[in-house]
Design a protein with these regions (language model features):
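Conserved Nudix-box catalytic region and its N-terminal flanking loop in Nudix hydrolases
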Residues: 30-67
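Short secondary-structure boundary/capping segments
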Residues: 14, 23, 39, 46, ...
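Charged phosphate-binding loop/patch that engages nucleotide di/tri-phosphates or the phosphate backbone
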Residues: 140-154
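Unchanged
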Residues: 53-79, 85-139
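Conserved N-terminal beta-strand and adjoining loop/helix that marks the start
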Residues: 12-32, 53-55, 85
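Charge-dense, intrinsically disordered terminal/linker segments
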Residues: 1-16, 27-28, 154
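Short, charged/polar surface micro-motifs in flexible loops or helix N-caps
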Residues: 25-31, 39-40, 91, 101-106
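A generic fold-level signal
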Residues: 15-17, 26, 41-42, 92-93, ...
Length: 154
């Protein structure tokens, strides 16, 4: 975890955008995925994990991931229930992946509170094998396997 006193310098020094995503795994070992809405400029109709950009107002990567899960899916997670999985270095961003098996609330896809745009228009709980079959998925299977291994070892 990056502590609050170093947080703003971390965000400012790093020229890449910081993104955090959460892999929610239910009791049947199914993973929550969200379909990006048709209004998405880059990946309309693609399936992805809940997540998004870290804001300077977020206290940590975990706090940003938890906020994004609440904004995008209506689920609440305690930062203590998040387990770090990996960091993916993308061309213009660093994507930090967390996994959890504990959350509260019911799925409620709602517009982004800042833009009032519906970012996702559908959700489903799937196995890794089912994700492989999706033609429009941007979720790497090796990350999902790594996340499932993490929760098995807890």
């Amino acid at each position: 975890m990056i502590y609050k006193k170093h947080w703003n310098s971390f965000l400012n020094e790093n020229k890449k955008k910081e993104i955090a995503s959460i892999i929610c795994v239910n009791d049947e070992q199914r993973i929550l995925i969200l379909r990006r809405s048709k209004t998405d400029k880059h990946k309309a109709d693609f399936w992805d994990l809940p997540g998004g950009h870290i804001d300077p107002s977020d206290d940590s990567l975990e706090a940003g991931a938890a906020r994004e899960l609440q904004e995008e899916a209506g689920l609440n997670v305690s930062m203590g229930d998040l387990t770090y999985v990996t960091k993916r270095e993308l061309h213009k961003a660093n994507r930090y992946i967390f996994v959890t098996t504990k959350w509260t609330g019911d799925i409620n896809l709602k517009p982004n509170p800042k833009t009032d745009i519906l970012e996702h228009d559908d959700h489903k709980w799937v196995t890794i094998e089912e994700i492989k079959e999706l033609e429009q998925s941007i979720i790497p299977n090796y990350i999902l396997r790594k996340a499932l291994d993490k929760i098995k070892n807890e």
